[in-house]
Amino acid sequence: IIDFVDLNSNIVTDLGTGGGMPGIIIAFMLKNMKKNLKIHLYEKSHHKSVFLREVSRKLKLKTEIFQENVFDLKKLKTGSIMSRAFKPMPIVLDLVYENFSIYKNLIFFMGKNGKKIFENSLKEWDLEYVEKKSLTNEDSFLLNIKKIKKKIKKNKKTKCKLFLL
């Protein structure tokens, strides 16, 4: 995943961080690489947010924990966005498209049903992406999505009426 993280930005965002995967791990890797990026961890659960703050403090990680619903926020700005086991792909694509005004890329973790989910998502979205096989599971893969655009739906039943005045 670190190969896909935009190291030239100031912020990396982890959506629905949960117990810290991948946000805390990436923050730790960036600290060891001596990179000056801040990781924004979005987790609406109070208990998980407390855990993330404690881990970040003890490991002296450069993180900021947002205990709020990311869907309620608008005009977010970041470099890379990471999404692992957060919400279904179409919902995450819509969230990024609607709520982030600036971002470099979306790193999306796909599980064993990922191919089918991804193919279905491509019916509604135009995506510029690179796919990378998972190192830990042969059925999984990562997507590095650089551009997200909604496809325009064509209504088959559109009728044209001519009105004469």
Q: Residue ranges of each PLM-predicted region?
A:
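Short glycine-rich, flexible loops that bind phosphorylated cofactors or substrates
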Residues: 21, 89-91
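Short strand-turn motif at the edge of the Rossmann-like AdoMet-binding core
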Residues: 44, 109-113
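Short amphipathic alpha-helical segments
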Residues: 53-54, 93-96, 119-121
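Short glycine-/small-residue-rich Rossmann-like dinucleotide-binding loops
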Residues: 85-86
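A short glycine-rich, Lys/Arg-flanked "PGG" loop and its adjoining helix->strand segment in the class I
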Residues: 93-106
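Active-site capping/gating segments
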Residues: 113-165
